[in-house]
Curated annotation (Swiss-Prot):
Name of the gene: rpsD
Annotated keywords: Ribonucleoprotein, Ribosomal protein, RNA-binding, rRNA-binding
Biological process, per Gene Ontology: ribosomal small subunit biogenesis; translation
Domain S4 RNA-binding: 94-154
Disordered: annotated segments: 18-46
Name listed for the protein in its UniProt record: Small ribosomal subunit protein uS4
Length: 206
């Protein structure tokens, strides 16, 4: 098992949910958490625990962001006019690694981060190797010519387990995508329920 595969499986086990909807997730085979005592009946979870879990799940989904990274994004979502939870989702979906993942250029969020880091991606014709780079509406994201024949890339575009959402226009024949608009929570194809409102409650109290 690769380090990246281990990381995403660890997050699924920790959450007890298949948060990316992957067919090989370990939680598809059992309905209890990791560890020796995973099968014990869980007690009632406190409001704090519910809010913390919502935050950890959202952080994990976008590649297990650090608390510092996530808190910075949240602070920006809070400053922007409008609903903080919706703003948070919009900012997360505008990350370059998230757009590369949504466009189905790669199979996982973790692969997207590595793909960007290794300079396989251009934004509006310029190489960008920062996964957290903030994409704007109308930006064109494309795979570099020398990277377009990578086997993993071609396989990812053919994955049937998820579709490209309508706020991204992807042309896999050109390995190119356009970020059409910033999505609302209801537009984002999360395989599990994400509750940014609980994240807002968490940070309001902690």
């Amino acid at each position: 098992m690769t380090k990246r595969t281990s990381a995403k499986h660890k997050i699924d086990r920790r959450m007890g949910e298949n948060i990316w909807g992957r067919p090989k997730s370990p939680v598809n085979r059992r309905e209890y958490g990791p560890g020796q005592h995973g099968q014990r009946r869980k007690g009632k979870i406190s409001d704090f625990g519910i809010q913390l879990r919502a935050k950890q799940k959202l952080k994990g989904y976008y590649g297990d962001l650090t608390e510092k990274q996530f808190r910075r994004i949240y602070a920006e979502a809070e400053r922007v006019k409008g609903d903080t939870g919706e703003n948070l989702i919009g900012l997360l979906e505008r990350r370059l690694d998230a757009v590369v993942y949504r466009a189905k250029f790669v199979a996982t969020v973790f692969a997207a981060r590595q793909f960007v880091n290794h300079k396989h991606v251009r934004v509006n014709g310029k190489i960008v190797n920062i996964p957290s780079y903030r994409v704007k509406e109308g930006d064109v994201i494309e795979v570099r010519d020398r990277s377009k024949q990578m086997v993993a890339l071609i396989e990812a575009t053919q994955l049937a387990e998820r579709d490209v959402p309508d706020y991204i226009e992807a042309d896999h024949s050109k390995m190119q995508a356009t970020f059409v608009r910033t999505p609302a929570l209801g537009d984002v194809p999360y395989p599990v329920m994400m509750e940014p409102n609980l994240v807002v409650e968490f940070y309001a109290k902690n």
